[in-house]
A protein has these predicted regions:
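Short, structured helix-loop boundary elements
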Residues: 5, 9-12, 29
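Basic/polar phosphate-binding segments, predominantly the helix-turn-helix DNA-binding elements
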Residues: 14, 18-62, 76, 82-107, ...
Length: 113
């Protein structure tokens, strides 16, 4: 199928693969959009239409999922998990985790929800 809708869907699938490969690195929506030859605004609209999430929220949610796994399956410190999941500081990680999960990472480790 070479329809524009199919081509757009292929680009979003490729963007998701790109995001997953670079998830724990510094990653911007502009960089992901450029990787599939789309403008940031067009990419963001297409991505949300296909996934239900804006691109940056998708990145955050994937990072939080990985952090939950690391918190419950390793003895890594919260700081180590912050850096391992692509955050540039422990404070940013804690804020993001609390905003998305509802509790702090340390408490999640003790009482996973």
């Amino acid at each position: 199928d070479t329809s524009p809708a199919h081509a757009g869907s292929d680009r979003i699938a490729e963007a998701i693969r790109y995001m997953n490969r670079h998830l724990f690195e510094e990653l911007s929506v502009q960089e992901v959009a450029a990787s599939v030859a789309l403008s940031s605004s067009h990419f963001s609209r297409q991505f949300k239409a296909k996934t239900g999430y804006p691109p940056y929220e998708y990145i955050i949610l994937r990072r939080i999922d990985k952090a939950k796994y690391l918190l419950t399956s390793t003895q890594l410190s919260v700081k180590e998990i912050a850096y391992a999941t692509g955050y540039n500081s422990e404070e940013n990680f804690i804020h993001s985790f609390r905003s998305n999960v509802g509790i702090a990472p340390g408490l999640f480790r003790k009482h996973p929800i």
